[in-house]
Design a protein with these regions (language model features):
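HINT superfamily self-processing domains
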Residues: 1-239
Length: 239
């Protein structure tokens, strides 16, 4: 959301001030890492939205209810990190944070709701980003529901696996960042063209999910040529 802070090679900036090509701080393999900002998946500077504020022992992150965040459920501290939607995080759950240069887990001590202005969903080459010193993914519910599950699998996936599938869905953007954003489009509001195509793609496959016995075959049969069609349209319209 507007006003959230991220660390770049230019220093700490508000998330809405990110520029194409910025190197942004994230956590990868348990260590601090810089990742490239590729553009906006979704941006609505003047839109009022209800956000969740997740407060930990040292910091807080404010994000949309269906944004995907990394966590460990309360009472399962020894389990591997997984993901969930922000509105499912509860007091006592653990979030991954950076504190004084150290990567650690902190408990959520308060969950609050507030209406604020500005939606900003950045995409980085890592698919993750540190926002206000808390690790979050770059993805929200529409990617999980329509793209990840529908395109790559015909059955629901654990969300931790869905993150890597969302990364796969955006592989063309990582290879050709101009498919998502450019210097002219980055200042404009709205859901970007490429994720719109992914959403449409997912809804088409959702239409055949009622054929449970055939859906795996259908998905395998149509996903590759449809992906090529989507890429072709995107490439065509980008010139």
């Amino acid at each position: 959301m507007q006003g959230s802070r991220v660390v770049t090679q230019r220093g700490t900036v508000a998330i809405e001030e990110l520029q194409l090509g910025d190197e942004v701080q994230t956590i990868e393999n348990g260590n601090l890492h810089m990742t490239t900002f590729l553009g906006w998946i979704h941006k609505e500077a003047d839109h009022n939205e209800q956000f969740l504020k997740l407060k930990t022992e040292s910091t807080q992150i404010t994000l949309s209810k269906k944004h995907v965040i990394f966590y460990k459920p309360k009472g399962r501290e020894r389990d591997a990190m997984t993901t969930t939607f922000a509105d499912l995080v509860e007091e006592g759950d653990l979030l991954k944070v950076i504190l004084n240069g150290e990567v650690l887990w902190e408990r959520v001590v308060d969950v609050d709701r507030e209406t604020r202005k500005g939606i900003y969903t950045p995409l980085t080459s890592a698919g993750t980003i540190l926002v206000d010193n808390v690790l979050a993914s770059c993805y929200a519910d529409f990617l999980f529901q329509f793209v990840v599950t529908s395109i790559y699998y015909s059955i629901p996936l654990p969300q931790s696996k869905s993150v890597s599938q969302a990364d796969m869905a955006f592989l063309p953007v990582r290879l050709f960042p101009w498919l998502l954003d450019n210097e002219e489009s980055q200042v404009k509001d709205g859901l970007r063209f490429y994720p719109q195509l992914l959403t449409w793609f997912g809804t088409q496959i959702n239409m055949v999910e009622s054929y449970k016995e055939e859906s795996n075959l259908i998905t395998a049969t149509v996903s590759f040529p449809l992906a090529m069609l989507v890429m072709g349209i995107a490439l065509r319209l980008s010139f």
